[in-house]
């Protein structure tokens, strides 16, 4: 079952049935997945005490090794100077690369297979805390978090001291709760097992495997869109599997005395965006500190690391932040562009030159440039996606071969962790919708900024005023967020709750009906926005969408054997960014002003002066021509067509006409991603039968329970 055996954790109830479910989890033998990510082995079978059998026990460490392979000594292969094991010496064992944290009864509570992430845990009496993140959390820190917390709110206040990168699983006063991150980088799913009741995981595919859940055609149809807005982005791909919203946690009450089953789970909100009150100088200081802390949390103490250095401001920022951690060896990787007008490589070379001219005690970074003719076009090697089963189809899938090349080259340098600048655009560019928020409190400043943006984008005056004064509610916008009409022209003002999308001409009537019904159902149920202010709603939704997409990079890294990180998706970075006054955080006259000020003194001023950004649209269009035969093969025997969602004949015609005006107006990347994902998912469940005639639509309230 590709994709299921690499990286996951499961939270189980304290019952005989929960113990039985533990024995059904897919797990490898003692061979590390980094060397063979699709290898299968015997299922993990805990003993009656909840500890695993066999050899290679990591007694009391509660952490996996840096390679995902148990050493049998309890030692991590990742250097962690001065850190303790971060676990109670009385609980937590592992066999192979499976870590078990038991209930007080001894039955398994948390079962985790973290290839690169660390499981840190502590138990004090009946209370317990488990953190799953990029590095080991010392026992003293865990004790300070757990022992001072009397309830959920108290624990959350203490957790805010850590980088916002962890899955949190806690038990206090008999209640268990689980949460991911506010950025959406770490997510939580749950499902009801027929015997064990509610089980939770960070991987929906694992829950689908355990419960026998079939694919949901309505959720699959939604993923054919380029952007899936809140709250529909929470629709899991399997029926009966539910996602807990980012910023929300999942509480799992225990069974009442004398009863056999616990009440059902309920969601609670643990995170609120901070008010935008800080001036630029103070906000920049906090952003810089949060970025530095996140980078240290990922790569601090490692001897050899790598960074993608595109030449843009985001990757340049992380290059210098990583350099500040003083690794023995820092490798910087740049993919040369085919476009002769591209400026990225020039700026990347300038960044390397500046980095090499730093303090003499810091080793000079190595720069590896991948020639443009070695970089695959988009849509190359589409069948290779079967190596990873992502949580959902992701539009970045057509660029997998390019990402795989870059990460493979990074691993070949000996890197033990790779950093990317993903998330920088979503956080620091700023979207026009934000001026709706500013208009309420400071209309003159808002109009001044918006006028500058309007002239840059060519927005007509009257439509801009109309959009600015529009006060439609979120459900009203959601009901009309998809249409069969042509794509909006580029000069259409964007100041609403999101982007209106056109249904693709190759979608079937069945797919269009499913998609439209999903949006209308969410609107009819009065779906609430992420934030009452449009700009903040759109900004946070964009960050969470980007965090979802980044999962594809993480999974490719797992396949290769190299952990990949995007420090910008740290909750502390998100919070520091949102806390800055809107009129200072974004500007039509400055490029990413908050990030620029945050990096002063870290990144040389000459590099902070860049105001341009390259794009790879030409590589995508050329990829349609270069890989026309692969695309034709993809649509021959299309699984999406079997589900009644796309017209395979229409797609075959487009494969033969790569420069068709249809493909200029409508991107095909999400459809390609859906097709390749579906093939991988059906390989994982070979008995799965398509249901192209199904007309039922799961309403949002049902899907989000």
Identify the function of each model-found stretch.
Residues 1-56, 60, 66, 72, ...:
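Cysteine-centered catalytic environments shared across enzyme families
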Residues 153, 213-219, 528-541, 588-590, ...:
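Structural motif
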Residues 175-177, 254-259, 270-514, 556-565, ...:
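ATP-dependent adenylate-handling active sites, centered on carboxylate activation for C-N bond formation
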Residues 211-212, 218, 226, 587-611:
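Charge-dense polyanion-binding interfaces
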Residues 432, 602-665:
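PAPS-dependent sulfotransferase catalytic core
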Residues 520-553, 560:
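Alpha/beta-hydrolase fold catalytic core
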Residues 637-705:
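Acidic, carboxylate-rich catalytic segments that either coordinate divalent cations
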């Amino acid at each position: 079952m590709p994709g299921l055996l690499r990286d996951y954790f499961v939270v189980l109830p304290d019952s005989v049935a929960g113990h039985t479910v533990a024995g059904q989890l897919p797990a490898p033998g003692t061979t590390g997945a980094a060397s063979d990510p699709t290898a299968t082995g015997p299922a993990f079978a805990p003993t009656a005490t909840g500890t695993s059998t066999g050899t290679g026990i990591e007694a009391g460490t509660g952490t996996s090794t840096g390679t995902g392979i148990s050493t049998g000594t309890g030692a991590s292969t990742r250097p962690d100077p001065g850190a303790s094991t971060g676990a109670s010496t009385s609980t937590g064992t592992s066999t192979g690369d499976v870590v078990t944290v038991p209930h007080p009864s001894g039955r398994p509570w948390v079962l985790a297979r973290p290839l690169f992430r660390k499981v840190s845990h502590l138990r004090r009496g009946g209370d317990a805390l488990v953190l799953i993140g990029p590095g080991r959390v010392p026992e003293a820190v865990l004790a300070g978090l757990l022992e001072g917390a009397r309830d959920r709110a108290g624990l959350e206040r203490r957790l805010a001291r850590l980088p916002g990168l962890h899955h949190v699983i806690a038990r206090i006063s008999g209640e268990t709760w689980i949460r991911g991150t506010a950025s959406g980088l770490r997510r939580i799913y749950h499902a009801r097992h027929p015997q064990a009741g509610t089980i939770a995981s960070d991987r929906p595919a694992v829950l689908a495997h355990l419960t026998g859940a079939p694919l949901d055609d309505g959720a699959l149809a939604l993923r054919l869109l380029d952007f899936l807005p809140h709250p529909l982005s929470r629709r899991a791909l399997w029926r009966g599997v539910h996602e807990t919203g980012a910023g929300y946690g999942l509480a799992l009450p225990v069974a009442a005395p004398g009863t056999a089953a616990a009440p059902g789970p309920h969601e609670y909100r643990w995170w609120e965006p901070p008010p935008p009150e800080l001036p630029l100088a103070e906000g920049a200081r906090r952003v810089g500190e949060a970025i530095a802390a996140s980078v240290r949390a990922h790569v601090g103490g490692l001897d050899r690391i790598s960074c993608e250095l595109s030449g843009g401001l985001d990757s340049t920022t992380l290059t210098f932040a990583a350099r500040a951690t003083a690794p023995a060896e820092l490798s910087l990787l740049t993919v040369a562009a085919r476009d002769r007008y591209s400026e990225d490589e020039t700026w990347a070379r300038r960044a390397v030159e500046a980095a090499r001219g730093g303090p003499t005690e810091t080793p000079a970074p190595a720069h590896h440039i991948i020639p443009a003719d070695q970089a695959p076009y988009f849509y190359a090697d589409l069948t290779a996606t079967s190596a990873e089963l992502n949580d959902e189809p992701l539009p970045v899938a057509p660029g997998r071969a390019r990402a795989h090349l870059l990460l493979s080259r990074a691993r070949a340098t000996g890197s033990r962790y790779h950093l990317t600048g993903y998330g920088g655009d979503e956080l620091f560019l700023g979207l026009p919708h934000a001026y709706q928020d500013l208009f309420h409190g400071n209309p003159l400043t808002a109009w001044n900024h918006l006028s500058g943006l309007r002239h840059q984008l060519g927005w007509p005056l009257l439509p801009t005023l109309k959009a600015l004064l529009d006060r439609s509610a979120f459900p009203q916008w959601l009901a009309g967020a998809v249409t069969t009409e042509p794509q909006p022209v580029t000069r259409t003002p964007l100041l609403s709750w999101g982007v209106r999308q056109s249904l693709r001409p190759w979608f079937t009537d069945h797919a269009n009906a499913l998609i439209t019904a999903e949006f209308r159902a969410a609107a009819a149920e009065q779906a609430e926005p992420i934030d009452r202010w449009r700009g903040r709603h759109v900004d946070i939704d964009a960050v969470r969408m980007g965090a979802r997409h980044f999962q594809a990079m993480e999974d490719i890294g797992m396949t290769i054997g190299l952990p990949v990180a995007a420090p910008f998706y740290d909750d502390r970075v998100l919070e520091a960014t949102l806390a800055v006054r809107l009129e200072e955080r974004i500007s039509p006259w400055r490029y990413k002003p908050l990030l620029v000020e945050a990096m002063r003194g870290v990144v040389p001023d000459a590099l902070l002066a860049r105001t341009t950004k390259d794009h790879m649209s030409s590589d995508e269009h050329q990829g349609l021509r270069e890989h026309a035969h692969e695309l034709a093969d993809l649509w021959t025997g299309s699984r999406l067509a079997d589900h009644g969602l796309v017209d395979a004949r229409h797609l075959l015609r487009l494969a033969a006409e790569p420069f068709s005006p249809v493909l200029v107006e409508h991107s095909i990347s999400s459809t390609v991603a859906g097709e390749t994902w579906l093939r991988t998912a059906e390989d994982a469940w070979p008995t799965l039968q398509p249901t192209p005639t199904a007309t039922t639509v799961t309403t949002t309230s049902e899907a989000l329970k």
